[in-house]
Amino acid sequence: MDSITTAASVVAAGLAVGLGAIGPGIGQGSAAQGAVEGIARQPEAEGKIRGTLLLSFAFMESLTIYGLVVALVLLFANPFAG
């Protein structure tokens, strides 16, 4: 593999994981904030709010996992390497 392609792949893999985690991280923080506020306002709805929160966390975390998969493909099965 060419050294420039290798270096670009490593940088791209790092960016894929790093940038792929920023959005879900911010989203999880704001979702948790909303859930805590909702539970504080209506303690009797805690179970329903918690279930919805955990489901939304799973969907948000899948975006981070997609970034990780892209990074692993770039590092170990690089389609750009000749």
Swiss-Prot record:
It comes from Prochlorococcus marinus (strain MIT 9211). The gene is atpE. Belongs to the ATPase C chain family. The chain crosses the membrane at residues 7-27, 57-77. GO terms for molecular function: lipid binding; proton-transporting ATP synthase activity, rotational mechanism. The record marks 61 as: Reversibly protonated during proton transport. It is a multi-pass membrane protein. HAMAP family: ATP_synth_c_bact. F(1)F(0) ATP synthase produces ATP from ADP in the presence of a proton or sodium gradient. F-type ATPases consist of two structural domains, F(1) containing the extramembraneous catalytic core and F(0) containing the membrane proton channel, linked together by a central stalk and a peripheral stalk. During catalysis, ATP synthesis in the catalytic domain of F(1) is coupled via a rotary mechanism of the central stalk subunits to proton translocation. Pfam families: ATP-synt_C. It is found in: Cellular thylakoid membrane. Keywords: ATP synthesis, CF(0), Hydrogen ion transport, Ion transport, Lipid-binding, Membrane, Thylakoid, Transmembrane, Transmembrane helix, Transport. Gene3D superfamilies: F1F0 ATP synthase subunit C. The keyword Ion transport applies. F-type ATPases have 2 components, F(1) - the catalytic core - and F(0) - the membrane proton channel. F(1) has five subunits: alpha(3), beta(3), gamma(1), delta(1), epsilon(1). F(0) has four main subunits: a(1), b(1), b'(1) and c(10-14). The alpha and beta chains form an alternating ring which encloses part of the gamma chain. F(1) is attached to F(0) by a central stalk formed by the gamma and epsilon chains, while a peripheral stalk is formed by the delta, b and b' chains. GO terms for cellular component: plasma membrane-derived thylakoid membrane; proton-transporting ATP synthase complex; proton-transporting two-sector ATPase complex, proton-transporting domain. This is ATP synthase subunit c. The keyword Transmembrane helix applies.
